[in-house]
């Protein structure tokens, strides 16, 4: 039985992950954590998310170290925000707790700081911009398309709900990274266009970020050439696609002693 702690426990992803863990054989929720001074601190997390009493009370991140130690958590799942996630990763690593990180929007410095803590404390972590199985097949397909259609004009379009705080999405940025890694030419990443931009250069890869409504996550990469256009799309209709991948990552990282992994490792795509 893998003992799991979840931060951002009352968020959209956190509450969904808790519910899915409880439905999954071999996994158990032992701690649920949210922001400091949360008014619901001490209340049963199951009752707070509407699934009935679980016997696990909501804790807050300012007491994370003691909660991890007292609960015996083996894996911590974090879908929060960059700054608190870095702090959480440092504390969890110090406590010998493995990590599943789905937070996006890190600066290079934040990511380096987090990875340093993971390596220094010799724990295991999966870090991914998107845990959906379909998205990772999308990523794998992009490798081939970039290799074969590298001379085409490439544009990336993503759309998310109006509450998303970072732009472009981590998934769109990862798609751009994969394309750049597999192109046989120089490339230049830009974000949207405005004004008199002049003709499009061959080196441009442009990301367009759209926000509105309750869109869970749409991503399309366009390869355009004279006379034809190829579009590769992934559209998420619910967060269950992400949550299913998180469960696979929890099981995967629960068997590892140390190292940083991604969803290609989890799914055997490397």
Swiss-Prot record:
Positions annotated as active site in the UniProt record: 160, 164
UniProt-annotated binding residues for (S)-2,3,4,5-tetrahydrodipicolinate: 161, 170-171
EC number, as in UniProt: 1.17.1.8
Source species, domain of life: Archaea
Any one annotated GO CC term: cytoplasm
Pfam family, one: DapB_N
Protein role: Catalyzes the conversion of 4-hydroxy-tetrahydrodipicolinate (HTPA) to tetrahydrodipicolinate.
UniProt similarity note: Belongs to the DapB family.
PANTHER family according to UniProt: 4-HYDROXY-TETRAHYDRODIPICOLINATE REDUCTASE 1, CHLOROPLASTIC-RELATED (PTHR20836:SF0), DIHYDRODIPICOLINATE REDUCTASE (PTHR20836)
Name the UniProt record assigns to this protein: 4-hydroxy-tetrahydrodipicolinate reductase
Organism lineage string: Archaea, Methanobacteriati, Methanobacteriota, Methanomada group, Methanococci
């Amino acid at each position: 039985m893998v003992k799991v702690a979840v931060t951002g426990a009352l968020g959209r992803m956190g509450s969904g992950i808790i519910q899915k863990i409880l439905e999954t054989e071999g996994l158990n929720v032992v701690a649920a954590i949210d922001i400091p001074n949360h008014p619901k601190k001490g209340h049963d997390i199951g009752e707070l998310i509407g699934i009935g009493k679980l016997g696990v009370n909501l804790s807050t991140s300012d007491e994370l170290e003691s909660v991890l130690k007292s609960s015996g958590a083996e894996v911590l799942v974090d879908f929060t925000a960059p700054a608190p996630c870095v702090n959480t990763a440092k504390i969890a690593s110090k406590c010998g707790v493995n990590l599943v990180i789905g937070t996006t929007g890190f600066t290079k410095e934040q990511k380096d700081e987090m990875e340093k803590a993971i390596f220094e404390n010799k724990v295991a972590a999966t870090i991914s911009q998107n845990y959906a199985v379909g998205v990772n097949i999308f990523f794998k397909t992009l490798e081939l398309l970039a290799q074969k259609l590298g001379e085409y004009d490439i544009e990336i379009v993503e759309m998310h709900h109006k509450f998303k705080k970072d732009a472009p999405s981590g998934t769109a940025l990862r798609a751009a990274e994969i394309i750049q890694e597999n192109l046989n030419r120089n490339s230049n990443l830009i974000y949207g266009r405005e004004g008199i931009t002049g003709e499009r250069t061959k080196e441009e890869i442009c990301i367009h970020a759209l926000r509105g409504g309750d869109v869970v996550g749409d991503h399309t990469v366009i390869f355009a050439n004279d006379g034809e256009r190829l579009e590769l799309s992934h559209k998420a209709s619910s967060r269950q696609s992400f949550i299913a991948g998180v469960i696979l990552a929890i099981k995967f990282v629960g068997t590892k002693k140390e190292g940083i992994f991604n969803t290609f490792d989890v799914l055997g795509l490397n």
